[in-house]
Each structure stands twice: as structure tokens, then as C-alpha cells.
Amino acid sequence: RAVIEINGGCNYTCSMCPQTDPVTGKTGARGKNWLKKMPLDMFEDIVAECTEAGLNVVNLEGSGEPSLNRNLAEYIAIVKKYGAKAFCFSNGMRMKDDFMREVVDAGVDFYRFSIIGYTEELYKKWMNSPFFNLALSNMKAMNEYVAKSGSDATIASYHLVLDNDNIEYEVEQYKKIVEDAGVSTEIWKMHNWAGVYKPEYEREGKIKTCGRPFSPDLVIRAGGLDGKTGAVHPCCQVLGRDDEAVLGHFQDNTLSEIVSGDLYSQLREQHRTGNYPDFCKSCDFLIDDPETLVYTNHKRDLYKMHGTNFDLNDYR
């Protein structure tokens, strides 16, 4: 799987996301050098190179909002050209009308709406947006168009538990949204973004490698250091610590050079020994807590990456 971020920016300022500056409340806290749009030709070059290594799935969001790219359908078409599945994780605010239909018609395989909060008030609190009902109607309309057009796409929602002492109630509230729209879903406990965000609860369990440095999973950013593009990160959870976690740049190096290079090799050794780098050691993905995926109504395993055949448990 390749997570290729086609836009490093976001049009939301969610309170739990490192994209949001905790002082100003504005987006872009990861730094201007990470808020780029990936050029279409570079995107195709990366997809083509990853295809030679056995690419199955491309996620087009990374840690940004893919629908900010008005030509999103062109990126999806490139993924399909190379025989891979095209996945998008999004807030869904822009996914409507002709834009939505273009995305579906281009062949998107999986489109997930992030909806944090099950009422307008909670959505406004956590996602800092008044577009709760718009997101719901967009999701429902997209699912209806998928059925009408004969597309094989899966439309899904993603939710976070807001109060760990009230999980059963919150799951039931989220399920009302899901059942009304007729979509797939998954509900998770919050995580801490490699220690950047501190949720009100702490996960409990044995600490061991998350498995990502050893898995066939690659995270490529739209931006990079020193004005470069195509930076490679260990995973999306280093959002907010972007500068620290760079393992190479597709602008400068080939896929083989990056994954076999000194920085990636060092990261794997740190995960073997438990001497984790600063951008990993506070991450709650290192904690073996099987209760983080609270509910799902489709085939989504805790450690199985969407659309792939590998399981992170095999690398832990």
C-alpha cells in the first residue's frame, strides 16, 4: 500500500488533529513546507514506481484533505490506470454534485467520511465546523449515486469515541447515522498522534513495535524539507512532527534507495531493539491494545490495512 498525500493542507480545524494550531486554532500547524499540492506528473511517477514493487492500494489523503484538489478524479484515474485500488479518507464537505459524480465515475474504490460527533453541537466542538448536516447529506447522496451508477465503490464513515465512560451510548448514536445513510463504518477510540495530542484516557497494554517500519506500507507526503516534495514518513501518525520523521524524498531518491537507505534501516533497528526515536516513542500505536477498534459493520480488522492482504500483527 502507498499512502500518497495529494494535498498536505486541510479546510477543517479539528480540535484533536495536529493540523490545527492549538494556540491560534488555525489550520496548517504542520508547517508551510508540508501544505503543498502534489503535481499530477510526480504522482503518476510515484504510482508507476510503486506498481513495480507490487502496489495494490493507494490512499490519496495522507494527512491532508484530498478533496481540496479540484482534479481529484484525475489522480484516481491514474491509480486505476496502474491497476490499483483508490482509497480516500476525507471530511466530505466538498464531496457533492458534479465533483462527487466525477470522483465516483473515475473509479474510486473506497471513500470514507470522517464525522467526529453525533450531533451538530458535538461536531462543531470537535471538528470546528457547522457542516454536520452537509457531511451527512453528502455521504448519503454519494452512496445513492454509487448504487445508481453501478459503481463498485464502498462509501464509509469514520467516528471517534468522545467519552470512554459512555462508549455504548455513543456507539448507538453513531449507528443511527450509519444506518440512515446505509454505509460501512468503523468507530475508534482516540489516539495521541505520536504524543502530539493528549486524549483524556491512556491506552493500556504491552509496548512493542507497531510493525509499520517492517510492513509493505509506504507514506509519501505532498511536501518535504527545504522546499522539496515527496517526503517519505514512517506513517501518518507523525503528523505534527513532520520535520523530524523524514526518511527520504522521492524528488531525490528512488523507492529502493529510500526503503533500503540508512534512515529507514535505522528506524527498523530502533523498532527491533525498543530504542524508539523521539517521534515514535510516545505514540500509543506502540501499545498492544485490542480495544481501540470499538465497532465496525464491515470487514475491518484492527491490524489489517484497508484493501491490502497484509496484517500488521505479522510485523509486530
Model regions: which residues?
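C-terminal accessory region of radical SAM enzymes
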Residues: K140, E144-I155, K176-R203, A231-V232, ...
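Processing junctions and N-termini across compartments
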Residues: I4, G8-N11, E204, G274-P277
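Short cysteine clusters
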Residues: C10, C14-C17, C210, C235-C236, ...
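Conserved C-terminal portion of the radical SAM core fold
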Residues: E5, A53-E61, K81-F89, V104-T119, ...
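Short, basic/aromatic recognition patches
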Residues: K198-F214
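Conserved alpha-helical substructure of the radical SAM core
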Residues: R1-F110, E121, K125-W126, N133, ...
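Active-site and channel-lining beta-strand-loop segments
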Residues: S215-L239
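Short, well-ordered alpha-helical microsegments
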Residues: N69, M95-D97, E120, I167-E168, ...
